[in-house]
């Protein structure tokens, strides 16, 4: 009987202790995130990662935790870790476009163009007009040397955002890489009309003219 009482007391004590620990962690989660924001703002990405990971040790396995961790790891050039974190976020919320957009960043940073292309197409199946997915897909095609596809993708983006200079530059280079010099010259010329000191456009124009 005495042993039974002691066991009950022990169990109750353990439950209360765990509850207290969880409460303490729950209360500290906002502080952990806030500190990670502050370290990120200072450019201390490794420190921001270490701070944020304290939340995981406190039981935070949320979508937002993995999403933010993936972002910080990307900023800190920890691309493999970033891919893993973004994939975990995507698993937790399978239709999340933002997690997939995040995942594209470390894949592209590593030059994993085919993998990034696959993710871009997954996004476009959910949101066909996504500016980021379409513009990144155009850039991916360019880096895969699929210049005709890059041209088509840049034109698609420009049909909705005709004033986007960087998309115009991407299109001009895609044309030049296909040896469509007349079209490329016209495209570069249009850019330089409005942004005369654009470095990439000027470089492209020199190549068109064989300088």
What are these regions (language model features)?
Residues 2, 21-68:
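N-terminal leader/linker segments that initiate helical-solenoid repeat arrays
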Residues 28-30, 63-64, 97-98, 131-132, ...:
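Helix-start (N-cap) detector for alpha-helical repeat units in TPR-like alpha-solenoids
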Residues 58, 92, 125-126, 160-161, ...:
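Structural marker of alpha-solenoid helical repeat scaffolds
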């Amino acid at each position: 009987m005495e042993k039974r009482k002691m066991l009950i007391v022990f169990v109750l004590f353990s439950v209360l202790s765990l509850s207290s620990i969880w409460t303490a962690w729950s209360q500290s989660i906002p502080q952990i995130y806030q500190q990670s924001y502050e370290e990120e703002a200072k450019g201390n990405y490794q420190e921001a990662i270490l701070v944020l990971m304290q939340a995981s040790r406190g039981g935070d396995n949320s979508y937002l935790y993995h999403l933010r961790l993936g972002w910080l790891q990307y900023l800190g050039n920890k691309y493999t870790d970033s891919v893993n974190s973004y994939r975990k976020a995507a698993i937790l919320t399978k239709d999340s476009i933002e997690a997939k957009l995040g995942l594209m960043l470390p894949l592209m940073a590593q030059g994993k163009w085919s993998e990034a292309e696959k993710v871009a197409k997954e996004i476009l199946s959910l949101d066909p007009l996504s500016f980021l997915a379409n513009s990144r897909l155009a850039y991916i095609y360019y880096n895969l040397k699929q210049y005709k596809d890059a041209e088509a993708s840049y034109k698609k983006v420009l049909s909705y955002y005709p004033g986007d200079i960087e998309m115009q530059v991407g299109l001009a280079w895609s044309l030049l890489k296909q040896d469509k010099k007349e079209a490329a010259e016209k495209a570069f010329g249009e850019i330089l009309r409005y942004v005369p000191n654009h470095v990439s456009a000027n470089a492209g124009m020199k190549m068109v003219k064989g300088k």
